[in-house]
Amino acid sequence: RRTKRFASLSRFVETLVVADDKMAAFHGAGLKHYLLTVMAAAAKAFKHPSIRNPVNLVVTRLVILGSGQEVPQVGPSAAQTLRSFCTWQKGLNPPNDSDPDHFDTAILFTRQDLCGVSTCDALGMAGVGTVCDPARSCAIVEDDGLQSAFTAAHELGHVFNMLHDNSKPCANLNGQGSSSRHVMAPVMAHVDPEEPWSPCSARFITDFLDNGYGHCLLDKPEAPLHLPVTFPGKDYDADRQCQLTFGPDSSHCPQLPPPCAALWCFGHLNGHAMCQTKHSPWADGTPCGPAQACMGGRCLHVDQLKDFNIPQAGGWGPWGPWGDCSRTCGGGVQFSSRDCTKPVPRNGGKYCEGRRTPFRSCNTKNCPHGSALTFREEQCAAYNHRTDLFKSFPGPMDWVPRYTGVAPRDQCKLTCQARALGYYYVLEPRVADGTPCSPDSSSVCVQGRCIHAGCDRIIGSKKKFDKCMVCGGNGSSCSKQSGSFKKFRYGYSDVVTIPAGRTHILVRQQGGSGLKSIYLALKLADGSYALNGEYTLMPSSTDVVLPGAVSLRYSGRTAASETLSGHGPLAQPLTLQVLVAGNPQNVRLRYSFFVPRPVPSTPRPPPQNWLQRRAEILEILRKRTWAGRK
């Protein structure tokens, strides 16, 4: 299903909520209401405008595991538990997205103490960027009270491709000192109610959805479970919140001020009675004084709580100015944007929908002929002197673009190959905006997506190259030249040298029987080989990149009919050769390309004053004739 690019669209995360037998034993008859209360708080976090997307977390199924059922294996290892749960939930999920029982993601709540590699401080685990992958869109959460809502939101944030706020990619986006107060903090204590999601989290989920990875979230569920709308503190007082966090013998420590900011609970630790905290605030709605209740970690008068009950939908602000062009020549991209700030949505109100980031082409003129490298080559070459990338590589590398074997969905990643070693790596998750998607394509990369553009480098243009590689031409400026070759001898033989400027090259080997014995080869003007030289053959299909960023598609030596094809135009002469390694029978090589027609010389136009000059000459001739008659 095609969706609008760079648009804010309502997403519905249909969620399967599962609780294991330890949850059932701890919570008893109140388990279902507790789980829905936790999910309501998690859904509220996803409705906050700081995430900058309309994300609706809905519960479509709730399963409580019991004895006698085939259940996932839940144990101390968080990684093993996650793997087991992901496998189990996939078998429970109907594959058809329109099925009412289908879900987009699954989350397991357990009272099992989960452990990571070195410590048992883990509160959950999930894969990153897996939301529409039925086998991996899953998460596990260790229940430790109502604050588990933020653990659930945190793990689902990973499912939406969010990283921890202290990660390197988030450093520039978040700024200094802001990595500990958001949902995606590596260790959560108090989440800022005014901005639960960091700028990095908002950027990552936006890019993730803009790149089409949330396609399964566009359908609205028919009959989701109703989540509680009352503040959780009304159903679970401070004592009960302590019991949910520290165990049934715990109670609230009322003597520790200030109220609401952090929940302190009485209990026993290592045999000593003491007050302890996990630094989470009291749940919203918890009574904190006469006619007072907590909200966002503050103790407010109950009349003020009404302001938090009324949803306010957001509205788009004005369009901003067009930004800088991503390129100075050769076809760049520039953006404008608008924000959902007129007004900002509040209290779970609807986030703005519609296009938020339009873009257009800019600086489409050709780059100077002195530019030795293509735009993608420049981006790869920027890593040539980086010695910190791979410890096993001795010194600087000569990085060049890699096209062969790169899937179409990965065309806009900066995949580069170390020329000397042949290894290739994704050096950047996306190329610069305006980079051609491939050597023979007019389409360009925009924010990591391949966007259609015409041969005039205008995004959305329908102009195409003709056979002569004239943009918008009618094919009249060139003519087809064809030939064949069948005088084969052992070793390499020249077939034809194709001059520079030729377009739409096609070479095809035809006929033959028995074992394959001849192969195509390409030799450059400097004598080096671009394909199948030095008796080394390319077995599979590949893009042969020639000087000037011209690409020819080679079928591979194992193809039944060996072919070479490409649009051109060639920047340098190219010699087509055949390598004969056996006794070819009934084999013929055919080739064709298009040659520019000679431009007819334009007759010299008469001078602008030719009528006056003609009159003057006629007058001179008339006078001479008259004088001759005298």
Swiss-Prot record:
This is A disintegrin and metalloproteinase with thrombospondin motifs 4. Pfam families: ADAMTS_CR_2, ADAMTS_CR_3, ADAMTS_spacer1, Reprolysin, TSP_1. Binds 1 zinc ion per subunit. Its EC number is 3.4.24.82. The gene is Adamts4. GO terms for molecular function: metalloendopeptidase activity; metallopeptidase activity; peptidase activity; protease binding; zinc ion binding. Zn(2+) binds at H154, H158, H164. The precursor is cleaved by a furin endopeptidase. Glycosylated. Can be O-fucosylated by POFUT2 on a serine or a threonine residue found within the consensus sequence C1-X(2)-(S/T)-C2-G of the TSP type-1 repeat domains where C1 and C2 are the first and second cysteine residue of the repeat, respectively. Fucosylated repeats can then be further glycosylated by the addition of a beta-1,3-glucose residue by the glucosyltransferase, B3GALTL. Fucosylation mediates the efficient secretion of ADAMTS family members.
